[in-house]
C-alpha cells in the first residue's frame, strides 16, 4: 500500500479545510461576533498539521482502489473531527459527540441535527453548518483532483471511492479537467439559486445559507421551522433547485456543450423525473383535504417530494401529520434517492432501475428460456460485473441497515422513530418520522446510538465500501508495517551518514 501518498493527501485535505474555515471568520467580522476567533484558531492548527503531513512529496503518486478507499474514508473522518472543533471549543455545542454528529451530518449532507434551537447559534456557526453541506456535496477529494496532479489511474481510483453511484466516468479525457468542470457547474447552479432567492426578497445571508444547503442536498436550515416561514415563491425556487441538484451532472455537461438531445435521452434522469411527477400527483390528491386548494396541495407535495428524493431534508410543513399513504411514499423515496453523479444520497435511481430490469430479465427467462436478450441501461449493455457489484451493494446495504436498526433499538424508542432515524441518516436525508420528524431533532439519542448513526451517515455518503475497508485487518497491517519499515529505514540512513 502506498502509505506516503495517503499521508500526503491527508495533509492536503487538512490544509484545504484550514482555508475553508476562513469564510466563517469573515461572517463573524460582518456581524461583530467573537466566535470567529475559534474558526481562526482551528484553521491555523489544521493548516500547520497539513503542512507537516504533506512536507515530504511522495516519489510515486500511483495508487490503486484500496488506497483510494482508505484515503477517502480517513480523509472524511479527519475532515469531520477538525470541522467540529469550532462548535466544541466555542461552547455553542458543549458536547464533543454532539459537535461531531452535527459536523458529520453537515459534511455527509445528511442534515440531521441535535440542536433544538438552531436560531440560538451565532451567524458564523450557522454559516459553517450550511457551508459543510456545500463542501461535502461534490466531495472534498473531487476538489483536490482539480488542484493536485496525479497519474490518470490514481485520479479515477480516488474519484471512484468518493463519487456516488454504481460507476464513475470521465466527462472529458483528463480526470483533473472533469473535476474542475464539475465544480464550475456546481458553483454556477449555486450562484443562480442565490440570485433567484434574492429576487424573492430573501435576505442575503439567508439566501447564501439556503443555497449552500440546497446545492449539497443537505437540509441544514437557519430557522427553527426549516422553510415553513418563507413565502410560496421562495419555496418553489428551492423546490426546483433541489430537484436540479439531484440530476446526474453528466446531463448538465451535455447541455453545457449544446448536446440537448443527448441530455434528454439520459435514461436515469427520465426515470428520476417520472418518479417525482408520479409521487407529487399521488401525495397532492392524498393531502388535498388538509390544504387550502389545489395549488397549495401541489406546492407542499412538490416541495417535500423534491426534498426527500434528493435527500435534501428541508421541510415546508410538518409532513409527519400527513396521511399514512403520503408518509409511506416519502419513506420509499428516502431509499430511492437521487441520480448517480449528483450531490444527492440514497440508493440512487440508476441502481433501482438496473435492479428492476434484472428482475424483469430473470422473469422473462422463466417464460422464454431460449431468449438471449441483453440487459441495457443508458442504451448500452450492462456488464455482468456491474450487475454483480449492484447485487453486492444491496446485500451489504441491507446488512448494515438491519444491524444499525437493532443497535439503535436498544434504547427502546418506537419502531417508526428507530426505523426512520436509520433510514434518514443512512440515506443522508435528515428528518424522519415520529420523534425524529421535521419538527424534532436527534438530540435525545444516547451517545452510543449517535455514533451508530454517525457511522451510517459516513457509510451512506461514501457508498459503503470505502468506510468498511477501514475495518479490514489487512489494511491496518499494511499501514502500520510500512510505516514501521520507513521509520527503521530512516534510522539506518542516519546511522550510515554518521559512520
Q: Model-predicted segments: where are they?
A:
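Membrane-proximal intracellular helices of multi-pass ion channels
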Residues: 1-499
Amino acid at each position: 500500500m502506498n502509505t506516503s501518498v495517503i499521508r500526503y493527501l491527508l495533509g492536503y485535505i487538512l490544509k484545504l479545510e484550514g482555508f475553508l474555515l476562513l469564510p466563517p471568520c469573515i461572517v463573524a467580522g460582518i456581524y461583530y461576533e467573537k466566535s470567529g476567533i475559534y474558526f481562526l484558531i482551528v484553521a491555523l492548527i489544521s493548516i500547520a498539521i497539513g503542512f507537516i503531513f504533506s512536507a515530504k512529496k511522495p516519489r510515486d503518486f500511483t495508487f490503486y482502489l484500496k488506497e483510494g478507499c482508505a484515503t477517502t474514508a480517513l480523509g472524511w473522518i479527519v475532515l469531520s473531527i477538525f470541522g467540529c472543533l469550532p462548535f466544541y471549543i466555542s461552547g455553542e455545542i458543549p458536547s464533543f459527540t454532539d459537535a461531531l454528529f452535527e459536523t458529520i451530518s453537515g459534511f455527509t449532507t445528511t442534515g440531521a441535527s441535535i440542536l433544538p434551537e438552531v436560531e440560538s447559534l451565532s451567524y458564523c456557526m450557522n454559516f459553517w453548518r450550511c457551508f459543510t453541506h456545500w463542501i461535502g456535496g461534490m466531495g472534498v477529494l473531487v476538489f483536490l483532483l482539480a488542484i493536485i496532479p496525479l497519474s490518470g489511474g490514481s485520479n479515477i481510483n480516488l474519484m471512484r471511492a468518493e463519487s456516488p453511484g454504481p460507476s464513475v466516468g470521465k466527462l472529458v479525457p483528463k480526470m483533473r479537467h472533469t473535476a474542475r468542470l464539475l465544480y464550475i457547474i456546481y458553483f454556477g447552479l449555486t450562484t443562480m439559486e442565490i440570485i433567484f432567492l434574492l429576487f424573492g426578497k430573501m435576505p442575503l445571508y439567508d439566501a447564501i445559507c439556503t443555497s449552500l444547503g440546497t446545492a449539497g442536498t443537505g437540509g441544514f436550515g437557519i430557522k427553527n421551522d426549516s422553510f415553513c416561514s418563507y413565502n410560496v415563491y421562495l419555496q418553489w425556487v428551492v423546490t426546483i433547485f433541489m430537484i436540479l441538484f439531484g440530476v446526474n451532472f453528466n446531463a448538465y455537461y451535455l447541455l453545457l456543450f449544446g448536446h440537448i438531445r443527448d441530455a434528454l435521452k439520459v435514461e436515469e434522469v427520465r426515470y428520476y423525473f417520472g418518479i417525482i411527477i408520479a409521487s407529487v400527483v399521488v401525495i397532492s390528491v392524498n393531502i388535498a383535504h388538509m390544504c387550502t386548494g389545489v395549488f397549495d396541495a401541489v406546492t407542499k407535495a412538490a416541495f417535500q417530494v423534491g426534498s426527500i428524493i434528493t435527500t435534501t431534508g428541508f421541510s415546508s410543513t410538518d409532513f409527519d401529520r400527513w396521511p399514512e399513504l403520503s408518509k409511506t411514499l416519502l419513506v420509499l423515496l428516502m431509499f430511492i434517492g437521487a441520480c448517480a453523479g449528483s450531490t444527492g444520497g440514497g440508493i440512487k435511481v440508476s441502481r433501482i432501475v438496473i435492479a428492476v430490469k434484472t428482475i424483469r430479465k430473470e422473469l422473462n427467462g422463466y417464460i422464454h428460456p431460449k431468449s438471449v436478450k441483453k440487459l441495457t441501461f443508458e442504451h448500452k449493455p450492462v456488464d455482468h460485473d456491474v450487475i454483480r457489484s449492484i447485487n453486492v451493494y444491496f446485500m451489504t446495504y441491507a446488512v448494515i441497515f438491519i444491524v444499525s436498526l437493532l443497535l439503535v433499538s436498544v434504547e427502546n424508542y418506537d419502531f417508526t422513530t428507530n426505523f426512520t432515524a436509520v433510514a434518514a441518516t443512512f440515506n443522508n436525508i435528515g428528518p424522519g418520522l415520529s420523534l425524529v420528524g421535521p419538527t424534532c431533532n436527534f438530540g435525545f439519542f444516547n451517545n452510543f446510538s449517535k455514533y451508530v448513526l454517525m457511522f451510517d451517515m459516513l457509510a451512506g455518503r461514501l457508498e459503503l465500501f470505502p468506510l468498511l475497508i477501514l475495518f479490514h485487518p489487512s489494511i491496518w497491517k499494511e499501514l502500520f508495517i510500512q510505516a514501521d519499515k520507513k521509520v527503521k529505514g530512516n534510522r539506518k540512513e542516519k546511522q550510515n551518514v554518521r559512520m
